[in-house]
């Protein structure tokens, strides 16, 4: 699961700026969509930032403001 900033989300590839990867999400997320609706908790493992290009995307989710803050603040 990736979090980042995109200006275009249609097509075969999506470029994300400042992307972060969730390496592990904890049970309290109740699935990957919890990462978009509440953001990662202290028990999740989040990787460092990088600009990336993703291919063959299966889903793009809007992230609520509170969840964005938690992604940005994750260690």
PLM feature spans:
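Conserved RNA-binding domains used in RNP assembly and mRNA/RNA metabolism
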Residues: 1-75
